[in-house]
């Protein structure tokens, strides 16, 4: 999985050299940012159920047909609602993985690479997940650098879905 740290090391190694002072300073900054990112991942994990359920409600409010249309791809019954929450939870987990990894590698490899095919195969609307992510962004309760780090990854996911 690619992260800013692994990419810097791979580049230096491919060139047969040690990391430069500039690269080391950048990596030191990334590691310092890591404390904020870990705090954010911890908070999001602790609030995951509340955030996911609130995000699902936001989707149902903005797209009421999702709860009135019968079928495997909608939330008209409890099974459908459980699937919706599961899928939103997956996006939230990807955000926490990116926070821990310090880059978009987890999202790139495990989500974005196949999201179009998954949505097309199962007839899922990306706009549902965009709405869910916007709700999470507006309600995660993080501040400062932790919020900035988190919002960057949420925005990355939103842009990939848009």
From Swiss-Prot:
<keyword id="KW-0089">Bile pigment</keyword>
<dbReference type="InterPro" id="IPR009050">
    <property type="entry name" value="Globin-like_sf"/>
</dbReference>
<keyword id="KW-0472">Membrane</keyword>
<keyword id="KW-0602">Photosynthesis</keyword>
<dbReference type="InterPro" id="IPR012128">
    <property type="entry name" value="Phycobilisome_asu/bsu"/>
</dbReference>
<dbReference type="InterPro" id="IPR006246">
    <property type="entry name" value="Phycocyanin_a"/>
</dbReference>
<dbReference type="GO" id="GO:0030089">
    <property type="term" value="C:phycobilisome"/>
</dbReference>
<comment type="subunit">
    <text>Heterodimer of an alpha and a beta subunit, which further assembles into trimers and the trimers into hexamers.</text>
</comment>
<feature type="binding site" description="covalent">
    <location>
        <position position="84"/>
    </location>
    <ligand>
        <name>(2R,3E)-phycocyanobilin</name>
    </ligand>
</feature>
<keyword id="KW-0249">Electron transport</keyword>
<comment type="function">
    <text>Light-harvesting photosynthetic bile pigment-protein from the phycobiliprotein complex (phycobilisome, PBS). Phycocyanin is the major phycobiliprotein in the PBS rod.</text>
</comment>
<protein>
    <recommendedName>
        <fullName>C-phycocyanin subunit alpha</fullName>
    </recommendedName>
</protein>
<keyword id="KW-0157">Chromophore</keyword>
<keyword id="KW-0793">Thylakoid</keyword>
<keyword id="KW-0605">Phycobilisome</keyword>
<dbReference type="Pfam" id="PF00502">
    <property type="entry name" value="Phycobilisome"/>
</dbReference>
<keyword id="KW-0042">Antenna complex</keyword>
<dbReference type="InterPro" id="IPR038719">
    <property type="entry name" value="Phycobilisome_asu/bsu_sf"/>
</dbReference>
<keyword id="KW-0813">Transport</keyword>
<dbReference type="GO" id="GO:0015979">
    <property type="term" value="P:photosynthesis"/>
</dbReference>
<comment type="similarity">
    <text>Belongs to the phycobiliprotein family.</text>
</comment>
<dbReference type="GO" id="GO:0031676">
    <property type="term" value="C:plasma membrane-derived thylakoid membrane"/>
</dbReference>
């Amino acid at each position: 999985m690619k992260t800013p740290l692994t990419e810097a090391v791979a580049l230096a190694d491919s060139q047969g050299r040690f990391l430069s002072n500039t690269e080391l300073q950048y990596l030191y900054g990334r590691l310092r940012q890591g404390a904020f990112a870990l705090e954010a991942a911890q908070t999001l994990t602790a609030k995951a159920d509340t955030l996911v359920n609130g995000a699902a409600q936001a989707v149902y409010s903005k797209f009421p047909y999702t709860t009135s249309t019968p079928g495997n791809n909608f939330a008209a019954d409890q099974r459908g609602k459980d699937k919706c929450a599961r899928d939103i939870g997956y996006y939230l987990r990807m955000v926490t993985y990116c926070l821990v990894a310090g880059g978009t590698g987890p999202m790139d490899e495990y989500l974005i690479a196949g999201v179009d095919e998954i949505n097309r195969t199962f007839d899922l609307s990306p706009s549902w997940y965009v709405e869910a992510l916007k709700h999470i962004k507006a309600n995660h309760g993080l501040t400062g650098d932790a919020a900035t780090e988190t919002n960057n990854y949420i925005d990355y996911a939103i842009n990939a879905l848009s």
